[in-house]
């Protein structure tokens, strides 16, 4: 291949990689989309009152638009409907690489539009903080669902709810066994019984380690209850969940969950 043709083909390949989104929709995925994404799952713990509006304004007017300019998205922003700590805002930020995770803060610092739009939040005094505490976890997507799956009806802002679940294990070996169980069989049963996944991830850095975290989406609580009942009654699930090495008693030490609702500007 001549040098000019080689350079042209290399640039085209680079452009395709750069424009690739860390998402997939119903259907197949390309070879590049099989590379697992990284997710930052952020929680803003708030006090009722001015902190709620201040944080919402910041995310809507500054953070989400800035992430979009950086090619990061779709970003999910959720309020807690049912959970142990309310009000808490959850933010799900997808990345295609660890380099993206590491570089984002510096890139936002250099974004004048972000700094201006978010000034009221970013420059609060210590005597009047924007939140009680922010927590963050870094997750690696599962092999069987390597990218975010955007729920149907997001563009039309259809009503929807989300269930965020965390499965803790007593050891790394047990944790990896539960990941294997999901990858090899359990996620397929989820899909068949109407439990629609948004993401599954192994928590690399965060609290309650070792754990895996995943998110499901439903039209409403009635659909949630109906589809979980179908899953629990499924013969394949009953067989899988009683298979030696895959029982909860062997590989899961605690399960916690929260129900979330998307903000009007959430991209999920």
Which residue stretches match the model-derived regions?
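N-terminal export signals
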Residues: 2-25
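Anionic, Ser/Thr-rich low-complexity intrinsically disordered regions
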Residues: 7-8, 35, 53
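C-terminal segment of N-terminal export signals and the immediately downstream linker at the start
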Residues: 18-47
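Short, glycine- and small/hydrophobic-rich beta-strand elements in well-ordered beta-sheets
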Residues: 22-33, 64-90, 96, 184-213, ...
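Intrinsic-disorder/low-complexity, polar/charged segments enriched in Ser/Thr/Lys/Arg/Asp/Glu/Gln
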Residues: 37-41, 88-90, 160-164, 211-213, ...
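Surface-exposed interaction/gating patches
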Residues: 45, 49, 141-221
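Hydrophobic, ordered structural segments
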Residues: 45-55, 61-69, 74-155, 171-173, ...
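Short, low-complexity, Pro/Ser/Thr/Gly-rich segments in the mature regions of secreted, periplasmic
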Residues: 257, 261-267
């Amino acid at each position: 291949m001549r040098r000019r043709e080689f350079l042209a083909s290399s640039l085209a390949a680079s452009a395709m990689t750069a424009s690739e989104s860390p998402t997939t929709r119903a259907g197949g995925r390309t070879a590049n989309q099989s590379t697992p994404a990284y997710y930052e799952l952020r929680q803003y713990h708030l006090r009722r009152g001015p902190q709620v509006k201040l944080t919402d304004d910041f995310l809507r007017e500054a953070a989400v638009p800035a992430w979009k300019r950086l090619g990061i998205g779709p970003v999910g922003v959720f309020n807690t409907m049912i959970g142990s700590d309310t009000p808490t805002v959850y933010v799900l930020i997808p990345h295609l690489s660890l380099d993206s995770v590491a570089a984002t803060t510096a890139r936002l610092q250099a974004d004048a539009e972000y700094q201006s739009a978010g000034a009221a939040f970013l420059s609060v005094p210590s005597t009047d903080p924007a939140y009680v505490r922010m927590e963050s976890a870094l997750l690696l997507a599962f092999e069987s669902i390597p990218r975010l799956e955007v729920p149907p009806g997001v563009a039309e802002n259809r009503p929807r709810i989300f269930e965020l679940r965390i499965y803790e294990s007593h050891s790394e070996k047990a944790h990896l066994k539960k990941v294997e169980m999901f990858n090899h069989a359990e996620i397929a049963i989820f899909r068949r019984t109407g439990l629609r996944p948004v993401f599954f991830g192994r928590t690399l850095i965060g609290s309650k380690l070792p754990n895996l975290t995943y998110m499901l989406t439903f039209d409403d609580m009635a659909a949630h209850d109906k589809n979980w009942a179908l899953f629990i009654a499924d013969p394949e699930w009953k067989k899988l969940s009683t298979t030696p090495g895959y029982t909860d008693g062997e590989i899961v030490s605690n399960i916690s969950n929260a129900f979330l609702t998307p903000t009007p500007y959430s991209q999920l």
